[in-house]
Swiss-Prot record:
Catalytic activity: a quinone + NADH + 5 H(+)(in) = a quinol + NAD(+) + 4 H(+)(out)
Subcellular location: Cell inner membrane
Organism for this UniProt entry: Bdellovibrio bacteriovorus (strain ATCC 15356 / DSM 50701 / NCIMB 9529 / HD100)
Subunit architecture: NDH-1 is composed of 14 different subunits. Subunits NuoA, H, J, K, L, M, N constitute the membrane sector of the complex.
One Pfam short name: Proton_antipo_M
Keyword entries, A-Z: Cell inner membrane, Cell membrane, Membrane, NAD, Quinone, Translocase, Transmembrane, Transmembrane helix, Transport, Ubiquinone
Biological-process GO terms, alphabetical: ATP synthesis coupled electron transport
GO CC annotation terms, alphabetical: plasma membrane
Gene Ontology molecular functions: NADH dehydrogenase (ubiquinone) activity; NADH:ubiquinone reductase (non-electrogenic) activity; quinone binding
Membrane topology: Multi-pass membrane protein
The UniProt record lists the keyword Transit peptide: no
Transmembrane segments: 5-25, 41-61, 77-97, 118-138, 165-185, 209-229, 245-265, 275-295, 304-324, 335-355, 380-400, 413-433, 458-478
Main subcellular location: membrane
Protein name: NADH-quinone oxidoreductase subunit N
Gene designation per UniProt: nuoN
Amino acid sequence: MNINIGLSDVLLISPMIALFLASLLPITMKVLRGNREQHALITLGQALMGIVAAVVLLVVFGGSDKTAFNNGLIFDGVTQWMGIIALAGAGAAMVMMYENPSTTGKQFSELIFLAMSSAVGMLILVSAVDLLMVFIGLEMMSLALYLMIAMSHEEKLSKEAALKYFILGSFASAIFLYGVAFIFGSTGGTNILSFMDNAAELVQTSRLFLFGVTFVILGFCFKVSIAPFHAWTPDVYQGAPTPHTAFMATAVKTVSFAAFLRIIATKSLTGSDQLFDILQWMAVITMIVGNAAAIMQNNFKRMIAYSSVAHSGYLMVGLITAGVSDNGAFGASGVIFYLLAYGLMTIGAFAIAAMLEKSENHIVNIDDLAGFAKQRPMLALCLTVFLLSLAGIPPTLGFFGKFYMFNAAIGEGLLWLAIWGMLNSVIGVYYYLRPIVVMYMKEGNAEIAGHSLNATTVTAVVMALAIVLMGFVSGPIFSAVEKSLL
C-alpha cells in the first residue's frame, strides 16, 4: 500500500508535531545543563506553550473533515472539540503536577515529557479512523501514563497502581486487537470509514464481524470504566498521585470516549438487538454500581473514582443514542458537551484534593473537610460548585450536560434508559452533598498544605467560574458543538 505524504497531511497533524517538539524542550535543556533540572516553572511554561500552540492549530485545521495518511486520521468536529477538551484537561493537570509534592523534584522534566508524549497519543487517538491507528494512539497514551504513575518518588501505592493499570490495560489492549483481527478477516480492512455505511448489515450477515465489533467495544469498556470492567478504577485513582488521577479522569477519559464514539457511530448496534440490549444494561449497571459504591466511601479520591464510573454509565447513554440515531450529531454532541462539563468539575475537585494533601503519603478523607468552609471559604465554595455540578444541580454546567444527553435519548425512544440515568443522578446527590455538609456543618481544622499552591488555587477558581458562567450560556455552546458535527 502506497501512502503519499503531502504538505496538507503535515499541516493537519501540526498539533501533534507542536506537542512533540514542546515535549523535547525540558529534557533537552536538562541534558544541556549537565543533568540538572531547570526551574520547574520554566519547564511547566514550555509544556503549556506547546499545549496552547496545539489548541490553536486544532482550531485552525480541525473541523475541516479532511483526512490524512491514507484516511487513517480525520480532522472533524469530534477531533476538534474532544482534542481541545483533552488538551485543556492535560494542561490543568500539569499545573497541579508543578506544585504537588509527589510529582515535583529531580525528575520533573521527565514527567512533563511523558505527560506531553501521552498527549500526543491522545490526539492520534481522537482523530484516528483506522483501527490500527486507534491502537497506536491508545498505546502511546497508555505506556507514557504507566510510567508517569510509577514515577511518584517512593510511594508504594503508586507503584501498585501503575502495575495494576499496566497488567489490566495490556489485557484490554489484547482484547481490542483480537477484535481488530476479526474485523480485518471479515472486511479485508481496518478503516472505520470503509465499513461505516454497511456495518449494520455486516453485523447481521457476518458472525466474524459481529465478534470483532464486540471485542473492540469490550476493549473500550475497560478504558472508560464500564461495569464489569471498572474494578481497576478506584484502586488506580486512589494510588496514583492526585495530579495524575486528574489527568486520567479528564484527558484520558475524553479521548477514550472519542474513539469509542467513532466505533459506535458506525451504527453497528442497529444490526444486532443482542449487542444493543447488552450495552444498554451495561450502562444501567455501571450507573448503579458506581453510585452504590461511592455512597460507601470515606476516602475522597475513592469516592470521586466511583462517581467517575457512574458518569461513564451516563456517557454510555449518549453513546448508545448516537449509535442508533439517524441524526448522530445530536447524540454525539450531547456526549461532547457532557465531557466538557465533566472535565471542568473533575479537574476542580481533584485540585482541591491536591491542596489538602499535606505530604506525598497523605490520604484525604471526607471527614478531614470539617471546618474547611471557615478556614478557606473561597476554596470551600469552589468545591461546593464542583460537587453540585457533578450531582447535576441547576444552573451548573453539569445539569445541562445531563439534560442534553438524556433529552437526546428520549428523542430516540430510549426513555427507560434516560429514566435510569435520572434516577441514578438523584442517588448521586446524596454522596455529593456529604462533603458539603461536613465542610459547612462540622467543626474542625481542615487546612491546605503548607507549601505554595498559588497555581492550583487559580486552577480551582477558574474551573468553578467556568462551570457557573458556562451554565448560563449552555444553549449556544451546545448549538456550536452540534453545528460542528453536521
